[in-house]
Amino acid sequence: MYRVKSESDCDMIHQEQMDSPVADDGSSGGSPHRGGGPPLKKGPWTSAEDAILVDYVKKHGEGNWNAVQKNTGLFRCGKSCRLRWANHLRPNLKKGAFTAEEERLIIQLHSKMGNKWARMAAHLPGRTDNEIKNYWNTRIKRCQRAGLPIYPTSVCNQSSNEDQQCSSDFDCGENLSNDLLNANGLYLPDFTCDNFIANSEALPYAPHLSAVSISNLLGQSFASKSCSFMDQVNQTGMLKQSDGVLPGLSDTINGVISSVDQFSNDSEKLKQAVGFDYLHEANSTSKIIAPFGGALNGSHAFLNGNFSASRPTSGPLKMELPSLQDTESDPNSWLKYTVAPALQPTELVDPYLQSPAATPSVKSECASPRNSGLLEELIHEAQTLRSGKNQQTSVISSSSSVGTPCNTTVLSPEFDMCQEYWEEQHPGPFLNDCAPFSGNSFTESTPPVSAASPDIFQLSKVSPAQSTSMGSGEQVMGPKYEPGDTSPHPENFRPDALFSGNTADPSVFNNAIAMLLGNDLSIDCRPVLGDGIMFNSSSWSNMPHACEMSEFK
């Protein structure tokens, strides 16, 4: 249980407090001595104690006031020694009342700092913080009794002026920095994507990326050499005029155009190697390309998948777009076309069913899926030439169920020159199954291909004479069709059929690529391998008969 203090205990505690000495605030502020020695002295300082303290400070300097008792034997605490030195014994200490200048400085410092006596004493040498505090407290009481303001009006006006000056200096500095930024052109307006798009649409020569796309450039380079060159020149001119607006974009497009030019040169060399070359007109000095599956005005090349000599026509030649295109696809995207490997023979036959033959007075209403419109003009022209003029004998072959609707081939006057040259080199019948200038490789005895017939091509033997002639300067490159062979698929006449991975054996494809990558591809084409065996695989058998007619320019 807690013991309750009795009245006798309280009286004893009170008596002890009365008997204990009272500390002098002015002379001592330290704690009583806790050791076994004599207690610390309190009260006013004597002259002997002042002399001991001054001598110690001169020897050891100010600081470490607690060591004075140990080193000098002075029975005073450290706090009492410090206050005696600072307030009474310092050599630079000022005695007496404050001057008018010191009073004005104290008022100004107090208006700025407040009750920071030690900081104010640093601005008043020889004056202690205690003296400054006593002066300020005495002044406040006097002003309150007189009803005067604590700070005079002059000090208040000076303080307000200083505040306004500081604010004005800050504003001037901020305005100066803004002026410098504007003078140096460093003003950065707000930028949004909407404004950029609106400004780019208003540019006079801001080209779109689609205008110089890879597919368009490739399609133009395969369609016409002059068309590709002029388009690239126009696009380059537009890019040069827009260099000041979009320099980074023009550099990128120029790099694309240069890479496409290099690809066009490589593709030209490849076309010459596989017989995909220009057709030389007898009455024209320009080269007009006839791509696979298509034809030009006045030409009868590749009507039914077989090569025939072209006939010069009267009147200007009209450059047409290549007919190697689907009605549902982009004309310039034929490189992306691939043959679906899962199609059955019946699916390949259906789109190419032959329509009834048209009369000479009425154009045929049938249109090939690849030749929309252009094939009808060729049929109409062939019928007109056959009925109106007495030219060479037209050879009409029976069409297979996989061939295109038109199977009529007209022999041109250059056909006689080719026939004479072939008879000089190879005596014998001219129109045979190995003649490269025959208008149609299939005769009437060729049986039609049914829907279930397999598309298998065998290796055919060639005679030494033929192999020797094929190894000469006038190289002939074309497939040999045996009477039992089937007709190739029309879609395999497309240029991309050479590169389809699902139509040829890998070894045959590698041999074909090795032949294409040989030296001087445009002149020296070596189709004969080994002991006079020519590959009639699906990829090379699908190629039409082609021949370089450089001597008949």
From Swiss-Prot:
Q: DNA-binding residues per UniProt?
A: 65-89, 117-140
Q: Which Gene3D superfamilies match?
A: Homeodomain-like (1.10.10.60)
**What does the UniProt keyword field contain?**
Activator, Developmental protein, Differentiation, DNA-binding, Flowering, Nucleus, Repeat, Transcription, Transcription regulation
Give any Gene Ontology cellular component.
Answer: nucleus
The record's GO molecular-function terms, alphabetically, read: DNA binding
Assembly mode: Interacts with MYBS1.
- Role noted for this protein: Transcriptional activator of gibberellin-dependent alpha-amylase expression in aleurone cells. Involved in pollen and floral organs development. May bind to the 5'-TAACAAA-3' box of alpha-amylase promoter. Required for anther development. Functions in parallel with UDT1 to regulate early anther development. Functions upstream of the transcription factor TDR and may positively regulate its transcription. Required for pollen development. Probably required for controlling tapetal cell size and promoting tapetal programmed cell death (PCD) during anther development.
Full protein name: Transcription factor GAMYB
Source organism per entry reads: Oryza sativa subsp. japonica
